[in-house]
């Protein structure tokens, strides 16, 4: 079960990355791991960085509810670590997005799905 979930997650991340590229983003990192958490995708478009959490579920609604407050905090902490490791991006604006993936549906990109102040 865990192996199947892992592969499903990788497939969802590939779909999300392809969707972002089609929207004009450049993928800077995938599966960026820190002691604080993991970021599925770090993407850039112009002077904007998007830290993207990818969620794959049976429906887009189920995927939307899968990003918990605890996960959000881990992603925020990991993003801070990413920014410290990449000072060349310190002047960029950034936001936290979610990419929702469901079978036989186009991905749904939620811009600014959460922020660091919540």
Curated annotation (Swiss-Prot):
Q: Disulphide bridges in this chain?
A: none
A molecular function GO annotation: nucleic acid binding
Read off the CDD domains from this record: PoNe_Nuclease
Its domain of life reads Bacteria
Q: Which family does it belong to?
A: Belongs to the UPF0102 family.
Q: PANTHER family attached here?
A: UPF0102 PROTEIN YRAN
* Protein name stated in the entry: UPF0102 protein Nwi_0116
- Source species of the chain: Nitrobacter winogradskyi (strain ATCC 25391 / DSM 10237 / CIP 104748 / NCIMB 11846 / Nb-255)
User: Which lineage do the record's taxonomy fields give for this organism?
Assistant: Bacteria, Pseudomonadati, Pseudomonadota, Alphaproteobacteria, Hyphomicrobiales
């Amino acid at each position: 079960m865990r192996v199947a979930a892992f592969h499903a997650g990788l497939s969802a991340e590939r779909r999300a990355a392809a969707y972002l590229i089609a929207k004009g983003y450049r993928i800077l990192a995938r599966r960026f791991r820190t002691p604080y958490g993991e970021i599925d995708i770090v993407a850039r478009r112009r002077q904007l960085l998007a830290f993207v959490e990818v969620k794959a579920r049976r429906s887009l609604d189920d995927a939307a509810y899968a990003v918990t407050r605890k996960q959000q905090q881990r992603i925020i902490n990991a993003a801070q670590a990413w920014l410290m490791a990449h000072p060349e991006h310190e002047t960029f604006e950034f936001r936290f997005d979610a990419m929702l993936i469901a079978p036989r549906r186009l991905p749904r990109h939620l811009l600014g799905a959460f922020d660091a102040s919540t």
